[in-house]
């Protein structure tokens, strides 16, 4: 699958564990769910929780053990963030680029980058409103028009 705003194909990806079975050293799904809820209450994003489970607790995948994804477990325990992780990451990237452009007025190339980032924000905005993940009245305010 190609990238959204480039001509590249996107070959990079992580290698999934070879065995879809649950590891033998895990006592049960309750232990994994407790860890996920604990890390979610500490403010970690779902991808950070997955990395922490993989690196520190030797749990490669949560779905074979619990039958649910990390975000589903977070939703069950009421520990989901107000914005989905991918939308939040793109909004944070746009905010950082806006801060950069305020300090560097002559950087015209990154004005275009900000336009592309904000296009991704609006695309995700429509999707998450349609599935009901964010409120219908949520609005991202564009800054590109003010910079030109």
From Swiss-Prot:
InterPro entries: Ribosomal_uS15, Ribosomal_uS15_arc_euk, Ribosomal_uS15_N, uS15_NS1_RNA-bd_sf. Pfam families: Ribosomal_S13_N, Ribosomal_S15. Residues 1-14 have a biased composition (Basic residues). One of its GO terms (cellular component) is cytosolic small ribosomal subunit. GO terms for molecular function: small ribosomal subunit rRNA binding; structural constituent of ribosome. Part of the 30S ribosomal subunit. NCBIfam families: PRK08561.1 (NF006331). HAMAP family: Ribosomal_uS15_A. This is Small ribosomal subunit protein uS15.
């Amino acid at each position: 699958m190609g990238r959204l705003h480039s001509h590249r194909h996107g070959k990079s990806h992580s290698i999934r564990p070879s065995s879809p079975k649950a590891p033998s050293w895990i006592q049960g799904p309750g232990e994994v769910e407790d860890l996920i809820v604990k890390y979610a209450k500490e403010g970690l994003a779902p991808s950070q929780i997955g990395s922490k489970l993989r690196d520190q607790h030797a749990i490669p995948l949560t779905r074979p053990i619990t039958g649910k994804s990390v975000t589903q477990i977070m939703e069950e325990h009421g520990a989901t963030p107000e914005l989905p992780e991918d939308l939040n990451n793109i909004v944070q990237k746009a905010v950082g680029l806006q801060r950069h452009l305020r300090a560097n007025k002559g950087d015209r190339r990154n004005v275009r980058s900000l336009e592309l980032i904000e296009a991704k924000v609006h695309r995700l905005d429509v999707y998450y409103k349609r599935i009901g993940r964010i409120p219908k009245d949520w609005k991202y305010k564009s800054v590109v028009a003010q910079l030109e």
